[in-house]
Every structure is written in C-alpha cells, then in structure tokens.
Amino acid sequence: RINPENPTFPAVVSYLREHKSGYRTLTGGNVRAQVNPSYEVPEPLNELTQDFGLRAAYNFGAGHLHAAFNRNLYNNRAETFVIDDPFQAFDSVNTSTVGGPSRARFINTPDNEASTASAGFLLKFARQTRLGGDLAVGRWTQDAAFYPYTINTAILTPTGVRADSLSALPQKSFDGKINTTMLNFTFSSRPVKGLALRAGFRSYDLTNKTKRIIITGDTAVSDRAWTVVTPTADNPYGHATANVY
C-alpha cells in the first residue's frame, strides 16, 4: 500500500501467486485401435497463476477518480499426458482388421496472458445527484506452441509428411489475440421528495484479432488415419466453430 496515511491519494500495489499441483478428477477417453478401450485416469495438475496489479485514486469533496492496471499470467506445467494402449503394441494406420495408435495423447489448457486497464469517476451534486462512469480495456493473448496432429507415428499427410511431425502444421503456434472494451455510465438523483430517478448505460465489446488458420486435414478420428477437411462458409477453419467469423 502506497501513501497509507494519505486518504486523498490512496494507491495499492498487489501481487497474487497461486500454485496448484497434484491431480484433478478422473479424466481420459477412448484409444481407437482394433480394440477400443476407454480409460479413466487422474489428470495431472501443475499450474501457476500470477497477477500483478496497481490501483490508485484521487478523492475530493465532490467525488473521486480511480484507475487500475492488472497483468495476469497463466503457466500450465502439465500441458499433456499420455496413455499407453495395452491392446496395440505398435503404431499403424487403421484398417478394417488391424491398426491404430499404441498411445493416446491428451492436451490440457495452454499458457495464456491477459492485461486489463481501467479508469473511472464518480461526481456528487446537490439533491443526492450522482454521475459515474467506468472504462476498461483488455488484451488476451495465447501463443503457446502447437502439438502435432497426432501421436501416431504411422500416419502420413497427403504430401507425405509424417502427421506426428511439427512440420505438418500450418503454423507453429496459435498467436491468438482478443481485445475487450467495457463502458459503463450511471446516473441517479432525487430532485423532489418522493421521486427518484435512475439511468444507466453499459456497453461491452469483444473483438477476436486472431489471424485465420486454414486447416485442410487432421487426424480427428482418434489418431487412426488422416482425414481431409474442406473449409466452408459455416466452417471457415475446416472445423465447426461456435460462431461464423
């Protein structure tokens, strides 16, 4: 806390560090080979979240002003875990009788960052009249390295590149960016006895600034074979998404 004895200019510097380790609840899935077992195993947990913050304000007789900035960092130290398939000794391309992956790899939450800056005011007038406003802008980013399409070493892309190789990917990392803007205004007053007036306005905008990645194929059918994917107007990335961009 800065200036703890000065109520006119209060300021606070904060730091939050949260480390979680151990295991989450049981998780897992199917390993698609000639035998399709389903596994439930404890999901490893090892993540670190840090938040750096700064808040300051200016108080005066007719109201106050305030501003803040926060920087949040999330680091997942257990990004993947692998399950062996006891019914499949080696990797192979799936056929009607044999084949499939000898292992399954599960990808957990990637590292990501967020920055938020905000400022606001509150003004006081006669007849219990109050006027306030807040503005907050944020930037969310995620640029963790991609993992290969599959862990199955036997699958090839149409160009002959091994699908478990990083060179088969359209790019090496996501380079994701999202901008947010929040605007909030409030007004209240009691101009005469028995009459109260209140009004408010709130606006929120989220803009995805991530560049489009075209994916023309994958091994989404559980690591068994390469599948060609054709982008369409509804699935511009080659996969169904929550929104049409």
Question: What name fits each language-model region?
Answer:
Residues 1, 54-58, 119-123, 185-189, ...:
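Residues on the lipid-exposed face of transmembrane beta-strands in outer-membrane beta-barrel proteins
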Residues 4-6, 49, 60-63, 126-128, ...:
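Outer-membrane beta-barrel channels and translocator barrels
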Residues 11-17, 58, 67-71, 133-139, ...:
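Transmembrane beta-barrel strands of outer-membrane/channel proteins
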Residues 48-52, 59, 111-117, 177-183, ...:
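Residues that define the transmembrane beta-barrel architecture of outer-membrane proteins
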